[in-house]
Amino acid sequence: MPSINAQLHHVNVTVPKSAEDAAKHFYATVLGLREVSKPEESRGRGGAWYQLGGMQLHLSIEDGLSEKCLSKRHICYTVNDLSVAEEQFRRAGVEIIPDDLPTRGWARFYVRDPGGNRLEIAQAV
């Protein structure tokens, strides 16, 4: 079967309207992602788009979501210094969720954004 040469362009996470401002602060300020302009036809829908290296994270508003949609599904962000990242999250008042299943070659912890989305923060060791 021939390859379709698929590449990851963006990941979309959703939060309830009530968490939109806190989520924007979380991704732009706490995580340090660079916000990019959305296409005009998407601007009236709320949320924000962020550039992350060669891909994007799209933050969308979804009606009917509970305040915390707890699940183990997650997006993994790699960092150069896990202890610096952990301290930055703690200073921002973000709860650190310890790694409950250590994986050889990686040090990591988890956090949740204001909409309840789970993020893995990892460093190769």
Locate each region found by the language model.
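Helix N-cap motif at beta-to-alpha junctions
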Residues: 19, 80-82
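N-terminal beta-strand motif that seeds the catalytic metal site of vicinal oxygen chelate
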Residues: 1-24, 73-75
